[in-house]
Amino acid sequence: MPNKLPSLIIIMLTTFSIILISFIIRQLYLHIAQSYKNHDVNDITIVDRLGSILPYWLPLLEGLQNFGQQILPDYPFNVMQIYKKTLMPLVIFYVTHPTLAVIIFFILYYLFVRNKSPIPDRPFIRFNVLQSILLFLINSLLGATFRALPIEFRMSLYGLMMCNTLFWFVLSTISYSIIKSIEGKYAKIPVISQAVRIQIDNQL
């Protein structure tokens, strides 16, 4: 029981921190949205572009957890060094706090996807949040499927080739989506972006 107490405290503090951060983000968003109230809702502002980039951290960390950790050690030393100094600490934190992904998922869904969202509707942010959630779910499904394969296959040449292909699929789709968000344009990923469009149209 004494050993479980620190873990419980850490979980409670983590949950409280996430709720506090989401509240602060909501207040900032409301304040900024208020300053843009005279703009057309379909105008893509700098806030929309920056806000559309943030949700893609969720599928990126999920993809690095599922595929990156297995194949990146085989990449050139310089690539691994850059990874260790930039993304690896975030991936370690993400892996050691598995409930974090679920909490962030529901926060994004509650704030941006629901019809009765408590914040003003921004179509560009909503599209990218929904797309990032879909990419996260696809990454989770692909990762679970890959881990379910026999370890002999996963460690074989064909298994590593499959893992490498899935890793680059994750990296390319997220990079493309982020670039389009910076440009203020809607991403057009085959099937995925179409599914997001259909979901948004059905909610209108």
Curated annotation (Swiss-Prot):
Where would you find the membrane-spanning parts of this chain?
5-25, 87-107, 133-153, 159-179
User: Where does it live in the cell?
Assistant: Plastid, Chloroplast membrane
Membrane protein topology class: Multi-pass membrane protein
Keyword set, alphabetical order: Chloroplast, Membrane, Plastid, Transmembrane, Transmembrane helix
Q: Which residues form the signal peptide?
A: none
One Pfam family for this entry, by name? TIC20
* Domain of life of the source: Eukaryota
Q: Main location per UniProt?
A: plastid
Q: Does the keyword Chloroplast apply?
A: yes
A cellular component term, taken from the record's GO annotations: chloroplast membrane
Q: Which family does it belong to?
A: Belongs to the Tic20 family.
PANTHER family, per database record: PROTEIN TIC 20-II, CHLOROPLASTIC
Descriptive protein name: Tic20 family protein Ycf60
Species, as recorded: Gracilaria tenuistipitata var. liui
